[in-house]
Every structure is written in C-alpha cells, then in structure tokens.
C-alpha cells in the first residue's frame, strides 16, 4: 500500500503520545523557526520527516520518531519539499 499522509492521520498515528512528544521536542529544538528559510513563529508550520515516511518504515523508530530525521519547516517550504519529492527528485537535505 502506498503511503498517504491523510490515511496515516485518519489512523491516529499523529495522535500517538510518542509522536506528540518528539514533535514538541523538535519545535523547541528548532526554536519555532523554519530551518530552510528562517521564518520565525509562523502560525502554519510542519514537523517534517527528512527521510519521507512510507508504510514500510512507519514503524521504524529511526525514521518515524528520531529527532535527527525531523525538521521544522514553514508551510511554504514544506509544500515545496513535498512537491519536489512527488516529482521524483527524492528528498532534499537542505
């Protein structure tokens, strides 16, 4: 099955206590600042997986819940990264 973020959201994965804890840690670590463009305190931001989640790696802590694989992006930068990934260019390691 192909990974779909909406399906994962519907499954409750993003409500797990483990995800919520690491998400909050990354927000603090990155000081509510987009690591790509430097936007500070934007209302809309995403804790982004550098190595994209797939159904195959969703249960792999080193990918799904490892702070070293997470970064804070503003919505604009996150959308650009996601579009690039979907076009088949792979993951940008900004």
From Swiss-Prot:
InterPro entries listed in its UniProt record: HNH, HNH_nuc
Organism name: Lactococcus phage SK1 (Lactococcus lactis bacteriophage SK1)
Stretch forming the signal peptide: none
Protein name in the entry: Probable HNH endonuclease
PANTHER family, alphabetized: HNH NUCLEASE YAJD-RELATED
Covalent S-S links between cysteines: none
Keyword Nuclease: yes
Alphabetized GO MF terms: endonuclease activity; nucleic acid binding; zinc ion binding
EC class (word): hydrolase
């Amino acid at each position: 099955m192909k990974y779909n973020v909406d399906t994962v959201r519907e499954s409750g994965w993003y409500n797990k206590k483990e995800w919520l804890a690491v998400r909050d840690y990354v927000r603090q670590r990155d000081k509510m600042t987009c690591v790509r463009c430097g936007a500070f305190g934007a209302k809309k931001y995403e804790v982004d997986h550098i190595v994209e989640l797939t159904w195959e790696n969703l249960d792999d802590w080193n990918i799904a819940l490892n702070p070293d694989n997470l970064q804070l992006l503003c919505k604009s930068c996150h959308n650009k990264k996601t579009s690039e990934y979907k076009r088949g260019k792979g993951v940008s390691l900004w």
